[in-house]
Amino acid sequence: MKAVIQRVKEAKVSVEGRVVGEIGQGVLVLLGVEIGDACPQADWMAEKIVNLRIFADSEGKMNLALPEVKGEMLAVSQFTLAGNCSKGRRPSFDTAAAPEEANRLYSYFMGQVWERGVPVQSGIFQADMEVSLVNDGPVTFILETPPKR
């Protein structure tokens, strides 16, 4: 499982011109599910992102996590994170999970974030989406779950 996390002042996702998810301060998470990912990977990713100390404290130091700043999450599924561009000019998506499994784990991931006390908004799985955001920093991180055992 891979994620791109961007600290945002606000973000929204639209489908066919209609806003389907919108947040204020928090993180935009682009989430890619790969073959072999399961609930333990989603648990790890939810725990890591919710508790990642990427928000400034009173001294301007990155020292606060989402719950401490009452931040929100906008989660957007993005199978292209599983893309491999190492050969040729066309990306290969051989490592991307099947859509049914990816959707199940995407939904499970969001549930785990909710259980940890962070409000979550989302895009629509497999929809053609437009994502708008105001980066805060910018602060961007790429996370990948530890190797599967």
Swiss-Prot record:
Q: Does the keyword RNA-binding apply?
A: yes
Record EC number? 3.1.1.96
Q: Where found, per UniProt?
A: Cytoplasm
Q: Which InterPro entries match?
A: Daa-tRNA_deacyls_DTD, DTD-like_sf
One Gene Ontology BP term is: D-amino acid catabolic process
The keyword Repeat is assigned to this record: no
User: Example GO molecular function term?
Assistant: Gly-tRNA(Ala) deacylase activity
Where are the disulfide bridges? Answer: none
User: Which purpose does this protein serve, as stated in its record?
Assistant: An aminoacyl-tRNA editing enzyme that deacylates mischarged D-aminoacyl-tRNAs. Also deacylates mischarged glycyl-tRNA(Ala), protecting cells against glycine mischarging by AlaRS. Acts via tRNA-based rather than protein-based catalysis; rejects L-amino acids rather than detecting D-amino acids in the active site. By recycling D-aminoacyl-tRNA to D-amino acids and free tRNA molecules, this enzyme counteracts the toxicity associated with the formation of D-aminoacyl-tRNA entities in vivo and helps enforce protein L-homochirality.
What domain comment accompanies this record?
A: A Gly-cisPro motif from one monomer fits into the active site of the other monomer to allow specific chiral rejection of L-amino acids.
PANTHER family (UniProt xref) = D-AMINOACYL-TRNA DEACYLASE 1 (PTHR10472:SF5), D-TYROSYL-TRNA TYR DEACYLASE (PTHR10472)
Indicate the quaternary assembly.
Homodimer.
The family note in this entry says: Belongs to the DTD family.
Q: What is this protein called?
A: D-aminoacyl-tRNA deacylase
